[in-house]
Regions:
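Cysteine-dependent PTP/DSP-like catalytic domain, specifically the C-terminal lobe
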Residues: 186-212
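Short, surface-exposed amphipathic charged segments that create phosphate/polyanion-binding patches used
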Residues: 56-60, 142, 204-206
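Conserved beta-strand segments of alpha/beta enzyme cores
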Residues: 40-42, 99, 124-126, 186-188, ...
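Positively charged, proline/Ser/Thr-rich regional signature most characteristic
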Residues: 1-10, 88-155, 159, 199, ...
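Short cysteine clusters
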Residues: 167
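Thiolate-centered catalytic microenvironments shared by cysteine-dependent enzyme domains
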Residues: 1-87, 92, 113, 172-188, ...
C-alpha cells in the first residue's frame, strides 16, 4: 500500500516494469500488483539490456514522484487467483490434485544444493529452470513463446490445467508467473516458496530425481 501511494499509481495506470536480469524481479513486482487489483501491466521484454541494445534513450536523473494525498483503494478479493498459501498447497499436494512448476536450478530441485534446512522439491513438481526461457544471445529477451510452450509440454506440463509456480523466495518464479500469463495458463505463485516449505520439518519432500 505504501509503495502504491508513493508511486502515485492507480488501477487505471498502465504500469511497465523492467529490471536488469531478464524479468524475475520485474515479474515479482507485477505479481504483487496483480494481487492488489492492478492488472493493467506489462513486462519490458529483455529489460534494460534490451533497451540499451536497441540504442534507446536513457537518463541518469532521479525521477521525483509526489506521493498521493489519499489512499488508493486496494482490491484484495481476487488475490486467491494469483497466490496460494502453504496449507492449501500442502492439502492439494497430499491429494495429488495439483500441477507444480519448480523453476529453480537442477541442483536445488534434486537436493544437491541446499538453500534451506532441507533440500529437494515438492512432491510431483516438474522442473523447468526460469532462465531457460531467456535468450542470452539476444539481450535476455524471452525465447519465442511457442518454443517455451513446446518445451514445457515435453516435460509433461498441461497448459490446459492450472499450475502453481515456485522457487526459493518467489523471485525467479516472478518470471515463471509472467510466462504462464503470456501462455494463457491459469497460474498462481506459491510465494512462501522453498524458503518456507524446505525449512519446515513436516513438509513432504522428494529428492534425487533428475529432470528429463
Amino acid at each position: 500500500q505504501a509503495l502504491i501511494n508513493y508511486l502515485n499509481i492507480s488501477p487505471e495506470h498502465h504500469v511497465v516494469a523492467y529490471d536488469d536480469e531478464g524479468g524475475a524481479w520485474a515479474g515479482r513486482l507485477l505479481w504483487n500488483l496483480h494481487c492488489l487489483g492492478f492488472e493493467n501491466t506489462s513486462l519490458l521484454n529483455g529489460g534494460i539490456h534490451a533497451w540499451l541494445g536497441a540504442s534507446l534513450p536513457t537518463s541518469s536523473d532521479q525521477e521525483t514522484v509526489q506521493p498521493v494525498e489519499h489512499l488508493v483503494q486496494v482490491q484484495l478479493e481476487h488475490k486467491a487467483q494469483f497466490q496460494i498459501g502453504y496449507e492449501e498447497l500442502r492439502q492439494q499436494v497430499e491429494n495429488e490434485n495439483i500441477q507444480l512448476w519448480d523453476c529453480r536450478t537442477e541442483e536445488e530441485y534434486t537436493g544437491l544444493r541446499l538453500a534451506a534446512r532441507r533440500g529437494g522439491h515438492i512432491p510431483g513438481a516438474r522442473h523447468f529452470e526460469w532462465s531457460t526461457a531467456l535468450n542470452r544471445q539476444n539481450h535476455l529477451k524471452l525465447h519465442p513463446l511457442p518454443r517455451t510452450q513446446q518445451r514445457l509440454e515435453q516435460l509433461g506440463f498441461d497448459l490446459n490445467q492450472p499450475v502453481v509456480a515456485y522457487c526459493q523466495s518467489h523471485h525467479r518464479s516472478g518470471l515463471a508467473y509472467i510466462l504462464g500469463r503470456l501462455l494463457g495458463w491459469n497460474i498462481r505463485a506459491y510465494d512462501g516458496a522453498w524458503s518456507e516449505w524446505g525449512n519446515r520439518l513436516d513438509s513432504p519432500i522428494a529428492t534425487g530425481e533428475v529432470p528429463s
